[in-house]
Amino acid sequence: LSSILSTYWFLFFIEMPRYYLLEYLVIFNRLTNKNKIEKEKEVARFYLYRENPLVSILVPGKNEGSHIFKMVNSLAEQTYRNYEIIVVDDGSDDYTKLICTDLYRAGYITHYLRLEDRGGKAAASNYGAQMAKGKYIVCLDADSSLDRDALEKILLPFYIDGMVKGVGGCVKVRNNKDTICSSLQA
């Protein structure tokens, strides 16, 4: 026992207590500030809905015809409703153009843009951003689907802290049983 202590004294007396102390402090801070955080969210939600800024949702993609409709449906279920959907077709050679044209005519998407020559996702995103009219821009993949309150959760940090300039999200794979690649991402 003494040889273990003499060899690993730093671990037992410095590192482990430091780790556990910090862990307990973080947990304690979360528990004591939970009401404050919820109050900040409620105030931010009030200001968000009072201002009601337009959000531009950019959806660049190539050969995403089979996914676009599901993504548009998940956006239709959002709790935050003031948004425009800009789909940029990056030179698809499947039936994406037909589906997006139908969605545009039916009013489900605001803009449908098509690049005849493939330029890649960045070029499609930049092209779509030129058409964006919103105060905020959200970039989505065509095969994405969102929780009902995702747009609201994306926007709230801008109203909680005025220094926030960008927000990222936690992406979870929902179709993790479909392909080997999707199961590896999950």
Predicted regions and their residues:
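Cell-envelope/extracellular polymer assembly enzymes that use nucleotide-activated donors
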Residues: 53-56, 84
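A conserved acidic beta->alpha catalytic loop
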Residues: 81, 89-98, 117
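Short, acidic, metal-binding catalytic loop of nucleotide-sugar glycosyltransferases
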Residues: 73-82
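Long helical/loop segments within the catalytic core of UDP-sugar-dependent glycosyltransferases
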Residues: 22, 102-107, 111-114, 120-124, ...
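The conserved acidic donor/metal-binding loop of glycosyltransferases
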Residues: 141-145
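Acidic helix N-cap motif at the loop->helix transition within catalytic regions
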Residues: 69, 94-102, 149
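Short aromatic/hydrophobic "clamp" motif used to bind/position activated sugar donors
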Residues: 137
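N-terminal membrane-anchoring/stem segments of glycan-assembly enzymes
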Residues: 1-48
